[in-house]
Amino acid sequence: MVVFGYEAGTKPRDSGVVPVGTEEAPKVFKMAASMHGQPSPSLEDAKLRRPMVIEIIEKNFDYLRKEMTQNIYQMATFGTTAGFSGIFSNFLFRRCFKVKHDALKTYASLATLPFLSTVVTDKLFVIDALYSDNISKENCVFRSSLIGIVCGVFYPSSLAFTKNGRLATKYHTVPLPPKGRVLIHWMTLCQTQMKLMAIPLVFQIMFGILNGLYHYAVFEETLEKTIHEE
């Protein structure tokens, strides 16, 4: 009896008939095994690129760390100028009001508060704005000089005027103003000292311009380095 082209009891090799796909199957298995043993090109590329990516990230972190250190030093310098302006204004208004009480307290507050206000304002409105909004160079310089005027001159002057005016009223070191003319009386009394505050005003504008130029130069330098490394 013949079943599927060969007799019963005979093997396919003996009859000379080879089933379709019997010789191709071992070749396919061998190719699959060889491909399975070798790593794919994408994995090799990933292994080669990984050290390069890590090196670029480390360099970028180094650039950002150096940039942060430079900005912190610059903010501290700018805040120190505001602190000296506060000390100068406190000295002038204490002489104006002839106050000799609480010297350490007033000098400490007039040195610390302008310093902190300048550092915080410079961080928020110059550095953070420079990296988030990408403001222009002119805008950066304008903001920095405005911070120098407000936090380095107007704020310490008003603070020294208020603190020493209260001490003068408390200890009666100067004649009290008449009713209804308090502000005019104090302004007339401190007219000379207010004119002398033009000295720190000029310095704070100058330091503000230099501060803005410095922050923008550091930002541009770091940006160029990171783009070049990428």
UniProtKB/Swiss-Prot annotation:
Keywords: Chaperone, Disease variant, Membrane, Mitochondrion, Phosphoprotein, Primary mitochondrial disease, Transmembrane, Transmembrane helix. Pfam families: TMEM126. It is a multi-pass membrane protein. One of its GO terms (cellular component) is mitochondrial inner membrane. InterPro entries: TMEM126. The modification Phosphoserine is found at S34. The chain crosses the membrane at residues 72-92, 110-130, 141-161, 199-219. It is linked to Mitochondrial complex I deficiency, nuclear type 29: A form of mitochondrial complex I deficiency, the most common biochemical signature of mitochondrial disorders, a group of highly heterogeneous conditions characterized by defective oxidative phosphorylation, which collectively affects 1 in 5-10000 live births. Clinical disorders have variable severity, ranging from lethal neonatal disease to adult-onset neurodegenerative disorders. As part of the MCIA complex, involved in the assembly of the mitochondrial complex I. Participates in constructing the membrane arm of complex I. Belongs to the TMEM126 family. This is Complex I assembly factor TMEM126B, mitochondrial. It comes from Homo sapiens.
